A protein has these predicted regions:
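Transmembrane alpha-helix/helix-exit interface in multi-pass inner-membrane proteins
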Residues: 40, 44-51
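Membrane-interface helix-loop-helix modules in multi-pass inner-membrane proteins
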Residues: 51-174, 181-184
């Protein structure tokens, strides 16, 4: 490749390592998007299991304990692994620098690190599926979570790790909006869609 051509998300080197070690905001946004789609389908599959159980009276596809586990995992996956981190992570990483006229986010390494923190927290939370599940409901309210199995702790820790990743991503977006806007783009001229990200 010609050395005068600047690398962007279209002409990166090929291979899995170029994706895993990228600092390009669009590629990181695509990684958030693909992981969000994966968790969306996993949560949707759990919703289908619940719907099949409730389709007809007396229809016992799964037991009551397994239903409570599926209910909790569906809610936790859809809220904490899809809606909260994946949508702002995907849309924000792809669109936010383009909307403010920046070439990249303010801290590209922090951007990649927050994706890996999100992935680590998601794996930690998914460990509970293999280890027997959680049956407290996705809100993890105290009476149920204190009387439940020991799987509440890894699920809660995974959610805290995912929340930390979302905080780092949000701080990166705030720094990008504040410091990397093009000249003339004042606070009152910012696109309104930046506020929802």
């Amino acid at each position: 490749m010609n050395e005068n051509i600047k690398q962007n998300y279209l002409n990166h080197p090929k291979g899995i390592m170029s994706w895993l070690l990228t600092l390009d905001h669009k590629r990181i946004g695509l990684m958030y998007l693909f992981s969000g789609i994966l968790f969306f389908f996993l949560g949707g599959l759990l919703a289908l299991v619940m719907r099949f159980e409730l389709a007809a009276p007396g229809n016992d596809i799964i037991s009551n304990e397994v239903y409570n586990n599926v209910y909790t995992l569906h809610g936790a996956i859809m809220i904490f692994l899809f809606i909260i981190p994946a949508i702002p992570g995907a849309l924000g990483n792809i669109l936010l620098p383009l909307m403010v006229g920046a070439k990249d986010v303010a801290f590209p390494r922090l951007n990649l690190a927050s994706f890996y923190i999100y992935s680590f927290g998601a794996l930690f939370a998914m460990y509970t599926i293999i280890n027997g599940g959680v049956d407290t409901g996705w809100t993890f309210y105290t009476p149920y979570s204190t009387q439940s199995s020991s799987n509440v702790v890894p699920m809660t820790l995974g959610i805290f790790i995912i929340g930390f990743s979302s905080i780092l991503t949000g701080l990166n977006f705030i720094a990008t909006i504040h410091k990397m806007r093009i000249p003339g783009l004042t606070w009152y001229k910012l696109p309104l869609s930046l506020i929802h990200i």
